[in-house]
């Protein structure tokens, strides 16, 4: 074998070795690239899962927040309705109490009107009735019950109940000329109209008749 032939073989072997090294390097790079791609894909999948979990958690928190708000609103409504029911019950009980007390007041006032005040023997009875009446009126006043006494005032159908009408010279028509029974208000709201007598205009005289 000549020296030139040996040299050519060595060059071919070196080139082959270089090609093998390059190929191995390329394969390693490709393998590393594939591995990196797999790692990135796995990490991206984890990121996607975490984002989904976060979105789900945020949605759950929002739903729970809405539920809490709705529950609080419902509790507030229940409390308000309960307070209204209690207030209605209190007003009803107070109206019933006032009605029963007013019957006693009416009876005592009628007793004072009908008793003979000129008779000295009735003096003690009169004082006792007056004290009892004043005590009832004071108690009613504490609960917001006040008398409506429209004597000499214009007739108001929202506050007064006309029992009769009468002509009275010198008095304007539709004026309360007598109070047969006082009316009463409870905290500014009418619970019993006053029974009254009302003046009326005199009939018109036809001058041509």
UniProtKB/Swiss-Prot annotation:
CDD domains documented for this protein: GrpE
| GO CC list | cytosol
Q: Where in the cell is it found?
A: Cytoplasm
Q: Which InterPro entries match?
A: GrpE, GrpE_coiled_coil, GrpE_head
N-terminal signal peptide: none
Domain of life (superkingdom): Bacteria
A GO term, aspect molecular function: unfolded protein binding
Annotated Pfam families: GrpE
GO BP, sorted A to Z: protein folding
Indicate yes or no for the key word Oxidoreductase: no
Task: Recite the UniProt keywords alphabetically.
Answer: Chaperone, Cytoplasm, Stress response
Would the keyword rRNA-binding turn up in this protein's UniProt record?
no
- Fetch the NCBIfam families from UniProt: PRK14139.1 (NF010737), PRK14140.1 (NF010738), PRK14150.1 (NF010748)
Subunit-structure text: Homodimer.
Its biological purpose is as follows: Participates actively in the response to hyperosmotic and heat shock by preventing the aggregation of stress-denatured proteins, in association with DnaK and GrpE. It is the nucleotide exchange factor for DnaK and may function as a thermosensor. Unfolded proteins bind initially to DnaJ; upon interaction with the DnaJ-bound protein, DnaK hydrolyzes its bound ATP, resulting in the formation of a stable complex. GrpE releases ADP from DnaK; ATP binding to DnaK triggers the release of the substrate protein, thus completing the reaction cycle.
Q: Which family does it belong to?
A: Belongs to the GrpE family.
UniProt name for this protein: Protein GrpE
Source organism (scientific name): Colwellia psychrerythraea (strain 34H / ATCC BAA-681) (Vibrio psychroerythus)
């Amino acid at each position: 074998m000549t020296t030139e032939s040996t040299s050519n073989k060595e060059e071919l072997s070196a080139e082959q070795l270089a090609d093998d090294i390059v190929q191995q390097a390329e394969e390693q790079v490709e393998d590393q690239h594939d591995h990196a791609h797999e790692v990135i894909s796995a990490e991206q999948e984890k990121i996607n899962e975490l984002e989904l979990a976060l979105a789900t958690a945020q949605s759950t928190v929002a739903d729970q927040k809405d539920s809490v708000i709705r529950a609080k609103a419902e509790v507030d409504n229940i409390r308000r309705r309960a307070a209204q029911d209690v207030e209605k019950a209190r007003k009803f009980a107070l109206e019933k109490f006032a009605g029963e007390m007013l019957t006693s007041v009416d009876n005592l006032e009628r007793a004072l009107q009908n008793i003979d005040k000129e008779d000295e023997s009735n003096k003690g009875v009169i004082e006792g009735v007056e004290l009892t009446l004043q005590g009832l009126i004071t108690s009613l006043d504490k609960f917001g019950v006040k008398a409506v006494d429209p004597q000499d005032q214009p007739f108001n159908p929202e506050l007064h109940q006309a029992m009769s009408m009468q002509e009275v010279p010198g008095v304007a028509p539709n004026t309360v000329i007598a109070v047969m029974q006082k009316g009463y208000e409870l905290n500014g709201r009418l619970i019993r109209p006053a029974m009254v007598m009302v003046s009326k205009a005199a009939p018109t005289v036809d001058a041509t008749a």
